[in-house]
């Protein structure tokens, strides 16, 4: 008989819910930190306009395949992620995050539950399955105060990435060349630290405007130092054509003139056109000769993958649910 095994972690934080949400709801960073494998997704459009996402990965001796279900969420409050396995030692894997505001800050509860598909699955769940999340979540809790006050840029502690042989000298020379230009703006070292010390999930697409917000510097300075870093060979760059619905990059090119004039988003099952003012983005990544970055994802459906989606609920035909959410004043698309 397959019995679900689960574990719940609970903490009290002095930080407001939105800060804790930013850390705990980032499933890309979390999965990478616990040693989960990257995976590829095959998106299968259905006749009713919906899409079934089938993910495939390998972990140790196991070939894994599962259906990546829609992640229900209410921004800054809770999410529920479901995986239904078609191949591997597990039948199901679920995770929940619930954040409740308190007088001092908030309370967060994080639950992981899994159902084995056989004897090997039962053995895995009975031994080391929860040790990775336990280590990472306890680190997160310990680092939350420093993350909330801006002392550290990320609450996740991960081993430094493996760089190509001779990379340290190469990085040093390239930083000197950038600093000799009028476009470094004193940001060269911070950019190098970000590109060559942060998680793969953070550097596969380095967005200058996001760096500007993170570092509290003018957007133009962040853009110029990234462009200069690409010119010198510290970074690479790619132009992306973004889906107007999920905002994921569905078409890309190393040069703007080769970017497609239109694209189809398999995730959303829609066609869309290129609009330079609305859905064309320039993103950077570490130079592949120095730090090759895995292009597959650690999580394709988490809340922080589509942070502009503030409420997402999946319903069965005829089902109704009442959802409570705190939304900022503005326009929303239903």
Where are these regions (language model features)?
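Short, surface-exposed coil-to-beta transition loops
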Residues: 6-8, 63-67, 90-95
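A short, structured loop/turn motif at beta-sheet edges
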Residues: 14-17, 46-47, 71-76, 98-107
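Long, charge-rich boundary regions
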Residues: 273-334
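A broadly conserved sequence feature marking short terminus-proximal activation segments
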Residues: 172-254
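Hydrophobic ligand-binding cavity/cleft-lining segments
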Residues: 1-47
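Cys/His-rich short segments
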Residues: 216, 230-296
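Beta-strand/loop substructures that line and gate deep hydrophobic ligand-binding cavities in soluble
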Residues: 82-136
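A conserved amphipathic terminal alpha-helix motif
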Residues: 1, 113-161
């Amino acid at each position: 008989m397959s019995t679900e095994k689960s574990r719940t972690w609970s903490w009290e934080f002095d930080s407001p819910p939105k800060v804790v949400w930013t850390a705990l709801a980032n499933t890309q960073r979390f999965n990478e930190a616990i040693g989960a494998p990257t995976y590829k997704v095959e998106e299968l459009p259905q006749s009713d306009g919906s899409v079934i996402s089938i993910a495939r990965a390998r972990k140790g001796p196991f070939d894994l395949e599962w259906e990546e279900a829609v992640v229900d969420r209410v921004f800054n409050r809770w999410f529920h992620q479901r995986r239904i396995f078609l191949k591997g030692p597990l039948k199901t894997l679920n995770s929940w995050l619930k954040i409740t505001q308190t007088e001092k800050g908030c309370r967060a509860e994080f639950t992981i539950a899994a159902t084995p598909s056989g004897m090997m699955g039962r053995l895995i769940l009975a031994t080391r399955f929860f040790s990775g999340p336990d280590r990472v979540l306890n680190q997160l809790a310990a680092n939350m105060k420093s993350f909330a006050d801006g002392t550290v840029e990320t609450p996740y502690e991960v081993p430094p990435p493996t760089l190509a042989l001779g990379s340290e000298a190469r990085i040093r020379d390239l930083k000197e060349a950038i600093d000799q230009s009028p476009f470094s703006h004193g940001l060269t070292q911070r950019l190098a630290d970000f590109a060559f010390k942060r998680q793969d999930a953070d550097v596969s697409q380095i967005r200058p405007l996001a760096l500007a917000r993170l570092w509290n510097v003018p957007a133009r300075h962040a853009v110029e130092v990234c462009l200069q870093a690409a010119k010198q060979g510290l970074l690479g760059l790619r132009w992306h054509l973004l889906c107007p619905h999920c905002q994921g990059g569905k078409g890309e090119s190393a040069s703007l003139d080769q970017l497609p004039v239109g694209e189809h988003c398999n995730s959303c099952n829609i066609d869309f056109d290129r609009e330079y003012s609305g859905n064309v983005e320039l993103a950077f990544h570490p130079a592949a000769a120095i730090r090759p970055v895995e292009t597959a994802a650690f999580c394709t459906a988490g809340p922080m993958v589509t942070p502009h989606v503030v409420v997402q609920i999946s319903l069965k035909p005829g089902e109704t649910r009442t959802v409570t959410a705190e939304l900022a004043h503005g326009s929303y698309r239903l």
